[in-house]
Regions:
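Outer-membrane beta-barrel porins/channels
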Residues: 1-413
Length: 413
């Protein structure tokens, strides 16, 4: 069974970019404290081999997106500065899915209490390709000299694959002939994952007649780790209207704030990441209502609706820093999700056929990179809700509509 599809493509355009809303400004801010000799390579030094160097900082320094304030210093300027006329574009393509294979057993006691136990094996595959670029006039390579015109494009490719296992337990009690109560618990899915990634910057700058052009690439990297997904708890109730139909309600609690990462070869590799998850992520609540009406003894019609809350705490939509890993800086923060379903079912003897259509509607915020707070003693305004920002990206609204059709054919033995 396909549990989730990651397939989607989207793009955004930006105008009026400043140093505080440029990707180069973001990289410059993150690079404070790193010396020129650390981030820029030489004949006998590869900065990517230095485990203390973030690859994003090295890539920015080697492609002139950031430039040192002094030849040997540890402070950096963005190529986009005061008076620079800048526009930008972002494109993203995501593909992949989560597929689940279930092995179940079940039974009942006096046709009143029904139980089921299952083991689910999961395959996880995710690919993302992105490109973020800016073109400008009046940029800076040498401090204080707005004499650079040109463009750059940063590309990222990330592939994640893995497999996991979890246990599902469910019970249903027939309280009366017409009323049913149900409960289910799904353990966390325990994944073993591998990330493979690479990034590059292609650039073409003209500094008062002096060209700076080229292509800088990171090495191809990979990383193995473990991931524990949230556990889920489901409560349900249903009422059966004789032979003519059924109405059901479901509530699902997903402990999103309890998911975690682990590196089996390091004690604290994900310590900070797991802390950030508990700070930024809240549990998800899903409410479902569905009905089935039997048109004839063989044909039934179905209708359903589900509402899912956002897993992101609201304060992180208003300028808080969202740390990202590696060179892939863009991300989305999902708001609520709505699901609408309709279907038809056919039953005859030992054969059944079900057809269903589902429409998913979701809103998100699209960030080309994270906001970064200003380095001041009090990083918040007096009302303590909005941080003062050194880096403030242009945030876009993203709405996606997903349509899917499912056809199920079954035979009872």
């Amino acid at each position: 069974n396909k549990q989730k599809s990651f397939d989607r493509s989207y793009k955004a355009g930006y105008s009026g970019i400043t140093g505080a809303s440029s990707l180069s400004g973001y990289i410059a801010h993150l690079s404070e404290g790193y010396y020129v000799a650390d981030l820029r390579g030489s004949n006998n030094y590869n900065p990517y081999d230095n485990l203390s160097n973030p690859w994003l900082n090295v890539l920015g320094a080697e492609s002139y997106l950031i430039n040192p304030k002094s030849p040997t210093g540890d402070s950096w300027n963005s190529i986009v500065g005061n008076g620079t006329n800048t526009a930008g574009d972002l494109y993203v393509r995501e593909k992949g899915s989560i597929d689940e294979y279930n092995f179940n057993v079940g039974g009942n006691i006096y046709n009143v209490f029904y139980w089921g136990l299952g083991i689910a094996v999961t395959d996880f595959s995710y690919d993302i390709q992105s490109g973020y670029g800016e073109n400008f006039t009046g940029g800076y390579i040498s401090p204080g000299s707005p004499n650079v015109d040109g463009w750059y494009l940063m590309r990222n490719a990330l592939h994640t694959n893995g497999s996991g296992i979890k246990v599902n337990l469910g019970v249903i009690m027939r309280a009366t002939d017409n009323f049913r109560l149900g409960f289910a618990f799904h353990t966390p899915n325990y994944y073993k994952m591998t990330d493979s990634y690479v990034a590059s910057v292609k650039y073409d700058f003209n500094e008062s007649g002096t060209p700076h052009e080229g292509l800088k690439e990171t090495p191809s990297g990979s990383y193995d780790y473990e991931f524990q997904s949230p556990w889920r708890m489901i409560a349900s109730a249903a009422y059966v209207f004789g032979q003519s139909g059924i109405l059901s309600f479901d509530y699902e609690y997903t402990s999103s704030n309890n998911m975690s990462f682990d590196d089996p070869y390091s004690v604290d590799a994900f310590y900070k990441t797991n802390q950030e998850i508990t700070e930024m992520v809240s549990p998800m609540h899903t409410f479902k209502i569905g009905g089935e009406f039997r048109i004839t003894p063989q044909i039934s019609a179905r209708l359903g609706y589900a509402y899912q809350t956002s897993p992101v705490k609201s304060e992180y939509r208003s300028g808080r820093e969202i740390p990202t890993a590696g060179t892939l800086t863009m991300f989305t923060l999902d708001r609520e999700t709505n699901y609408f379903t309709v279907g038809l079912g056919y039953r005859f003897s030992n054969v059944y056929v079900d057809m269903a259509y589902m429409h998913r509607y979701r809103r998100s915020e699209l960030f080309p990179f994270s906001p970064l707070p200003a380095a001041v003693d009090n990083p918040y305004n007096p009302d303590q809700t909005e941080p003062l920002l050194a880096i403030s990206p242009q945030i876009s609204s993203l709405t996606d509509h997903n349509n899917s059709f499912v056809l199920t054919l079954g035979v009872k033995f």
